[in-house]
Amino acid sequence: MSYRELVVELAREHAEALSDALLDLGALSVSVEDADADTPDEQPLFGEPGLVPERTAWQHSRVVALLSPDLEPAVLLAAAANEIGIADTPKFDVREVEEQDWVRLTQSQFEPIPIGERIWVVPSWHDAPDPDALILELDPGLAFGTGSHPTTRLCMEWLEQTVKPGQSVLDYGCGSGILAILARKCGADPVIGIDIDPQAVESARQNSERNHADVTYGLPDACPDGEFDIVVANILSNPLKLMASMLASKVKPGGRIALSGVLARQADEVAAVYARYVDISVWREHEGWVCLAGTRRESH
């Protein structure tokens, strides 16, 4: 089967949020274009070099998302629209894309990514820019998480600053396994990665083997009993709220928890749900997304 492009035209105020939601829900890549390009209504977004742009998207924007063959465009778009508060699913088109085009596009667009103080995420077709750094070798794939998205970056920066050797870590919603692998490379042991998607679990296992990281992965029913020193969950705000009691119960008293996949405007609502269990606040914000971090109280 061929890869597909989902093409949606919508107003500027929804374009960026929809792009982020599509990525969170499994799109391989997303771009925002001027829907009026090459017409009399075309609007330059950026002005003179060195000047800060007045806008970050066009008034009439086109969102183009690349989808793997197993994703149903209509279902994905409806879920993304619901996530950002659009009641009616926008009109859309679907275009077929040859698989070999995607492979070439991947290798031309993905470069090594520096994160935090000493982390590099490096595709397999690149050499590590700094062999002495903390290197994670990951290729873009069907499972979310290559370090390029703000939520992944935020969680990685938090883990780099938080994990101490020998601590136990639970990565709930592990996707590609990038956070679990990083935790293990920072000295955490044991590290458990959980995801609802069997394909993500298999991808995470393969990525851990490639990175020589001893991490145990499984579906939610395989999540071990007991508590962890650190719990990290980079998913979406609604699932985070629904799973608050369960996730908080996985943190040892005095242990740490980090939550992302949360837009800045959703932070207070998510924090309010978790405040029943943990002392939590916004740790850091990046490009409109936040990482919430907190400590479980000794009793609740």
Swiss-Prot record:
Pfam families: PrmA
Main location (coarse class): cytoplasm
GO molecular function, one term: protein-lysine N-methyltransferase activity
Localization: Cytoplasm
CDD domains the record matches: AdoMet_MTases
Domain of life of the native organism: Bacteria
RNA-binding among keywords: no
Enzyme Commission identifier(s): 2.1.1.-
Swiss-Prot/TrEMBL catalytic activity: L-lysyl-[protein] + 3 S-adenosyl-L-methionine = N(6),N(6),N(6)-trimethyl-L-lysyl-[protein] + 3 S-adenosyl-L-homocysteine + 3 H(+)
NCBIfam families the UniProt entry points to: prmA
Described purpose of this protein according to its UniProt entry: Methylates ribosomal protein L11.
Family, similarity comment: Belongs to the methyltransferase superfamily. PrmA family.
Protein known as: Ribosomal protein L11 methyltransferase
Underlying gene: prmA
